[in-house]
């Protein structure tokens, strides 16, 4: 009568792997940086290239982090025991 229901361990890296596959930002940010490097030819453009690449990298990093948090919440919202793990890691 005493049955122990075994639950699979929570895979913490699953939302991160999902976000790597689903995030177009993580794919587009290196492409944008390579595009900016190729199209900066003179020194006047290279100063604006540095500014533009910093902005592109910052925005893509921010959006990737936001997407990781959203996917992390979706992945663990179905299991109430995992919500404590979700809040302890975020």
From Swiss-Prot:
It is found in: Membrane. GO terms for cellular component: membrane. Its main location: membrane. It is a multi-pass membrane protein. The chain crosses the membrane at residues 17-37, 55-75. Keywords: Membrane, Transmembrane, Transmembrane helix. This is Putative uncharacterized membrane protein PB18E9.05c.
